[in-house]
């Protein structure tokens, strides 16, 4: 595993080691899962993975912002944002409880 960051390759390698699929098959599974999640999010669906967390989409309305250098008001356009909410069990695991 890479120091500090878990990558797609790390996940595929772990699947390869634990399940015994080939590296190519493991990488294809990882890509398929991530593609499916991305497609669902792009279609406006939230993605919930039990025991892990939920990727939540939220629509933000237009609002007025301010240029910090000039102080001039500028409109911030409406947009959709994605956040991740970790499950209770994931929060406890990360906290070491």
UniProtKB/Swiss-Prot annotation:
Single GO cellular component term: cytosol
Domain of life: Bacteria
Alphabetized UniProt keyword annotations: DNA recombination, DNA-binding, Transcription, Transcription regulation, Translation regulation
BP-aspect Gene Ontology terms: DNA recombination; positive regulation of metabolic process; regulation of DNA-templated transcription; regulation of translation
Disulfide bonds: none
A molecular-function term among this protein's GO annotations: structural constituent of chromatin
PROSITE patterns on file: HISTONE_LIKE (PS00045)
Cited InterPro entries: Hist_DNA-bd (IPR000119), Histone-like_DNA-bd_CS (IPR020816), IHF-like_DNA-bd_dom_sf (IPR010992), IHF_alpha (IPR005684)
Residue ranges crossing the lipid bilayer per the database entry: none
Alphabetized NCBIfam families for the sequence: himA, PRK00285.1
Family label: Belongs to the bacterial histone-like protein family.
Subunit and interaction comment: Heterodimer of an alpha and a beta chain.
Function: This protein is one of the two subunits of integration host factor, a specific DNA-binding protein that functions in genetic recombination as well as in transcriptional and translational control.
PANTHER family per record: DNA-BINDING PROTEIN HU, INTEGRATION HOST FACTOR SUBUNIT ALPHA
The protein's name in its UniProt record: Integration host factor subunit alpha
Species this chain originates from: Sphingopyxis alaskensis (strain DSM 13593 / LMG 18877 / RB2256) (Sphingomonas alaskensis)
Source lineage: Bacteria, Pseudomonadati, Pseudomonadota, Alphaproteobacteria, Sphingomonadales
Gene: ihfA
